[in-house]
From Swiss-Prot:
Molecular function GO labels: metal ion binding; metalloendopeptidase activity
Protein name: Mitochondrial inner membrane protease ATP23
Keywords: Hydrolase, Membrane, Metal-binding, Metalloprotease, Mitochondrion, Mitochondrion inner membrane, Protease
Binding of a divalent metal cation, residues: 139, 143
Organism of derivation: Ajellomyces capsulatus (strain NAm1 / WU24)
Length: 240
């Protein structure tokens, strides 16, 4: 998910307070033991979170280095990022490039976030491959474009939040059929794109402090859906 979220990235070391099935340790034997506990159903959900956190801490340097290398490649060679979104952001007086696209380890389970003061944060430990990174960068760059063009109120206006989430999910490529079908197990053949955009926009709105609950998030998304889904600026159409 994206938007102006506070993305945690701390040095916490997982220490189980009870028997969760997770055993701390970075050696091969301990890793095999933890994997066996997961495969046999002997690790609780809390234990799985501890396992993932330990893995992310262990791989942090490599994850961030890979993310930065792929980020720099995409900025140089990806048409949607370098020649289009980046250029349109520049035309509005902004600048999104490697100096403010930060690859970090995140403790929240999301792909990235945008903050008008900070720039873009990519959760390096959540990136599955270069294609996933490209979609995430495009999503967050759409937020940057909307912030500059429409002067969004990120703090209190849920309609603004819903609109930019609809546009970012629709235009970034993250809701194209192949990604939904093969990565997320969403197997519908009709209205798949629209349902993906609605679902992801509502989840992002629901994470904001001003949103009461899931029903409130859905209501706000529905209120702005028609105008925001049809608005494909700066693109001529949804092409990914």
């Amino acid at each position: 998910m994206a938007g102006t979220n506070s993305l945690g990235a701390g040095p916490d070391t997982p220490v189980p307070s009870k028997d969760t099935g997770f055993t701390p340790g970075d050696d091969t034997w301990t890793q095999m033991k933890n994997m066996f506990s997961i495969l046999t159903g002997n690790m609780t959900e809390e234990g799985k979170e501890q396992f993932l956190l330990a893995r992310d801490i262990r791989n942090e340097e490599n994850d961030c280095k890979r993310c930065e290398d792929q980020r720099d490649y995409l900025i140089k060679y990806s048409p949607i990022i370098i020649r289009f979104l980046q250029d349109n952001i520049r035309q509005l007086g902004g600048d999104i490039s490697s100096h403010n696209i930060h690859c970090r380890r995140c403790t929240q389970r999301q792909a990235g976030g945008f903050d008008p003061q900070y720039g873009i944060r990519i959760c390096a430990n959540a990136m599955k491959d270069q294609g996933h990174l490209e979609d995430t960068m495009a999503h967050e760059m759409m937020h940057a474009y909307d912030h500059l063009r429409f002067k969004l109120d990120w703090t209190d206006n849920l309609r603004h939040a819903a609109c930019t989430e609809i546009r970012a999910s629709s235009l970034s490529g993250e809701c194209r059929w192949a990604r939904e079908f093969f990565r997320r197990g969403q197997w519908k053949l009709t209205q798949q794109h629209q349902e993906c955009v609605r679902r992801r926009a509502a989840l992002s709105v629901m994470a904001r402090p001003a949103c009461k609950d899931a029903e409130h998030a859905k209501q706000v998304v529905d209120e702005v859906w028609d105008s925001c889904f049809r608005d494909t600026r700066p693109f001529d159409e949804i092409y990914r």
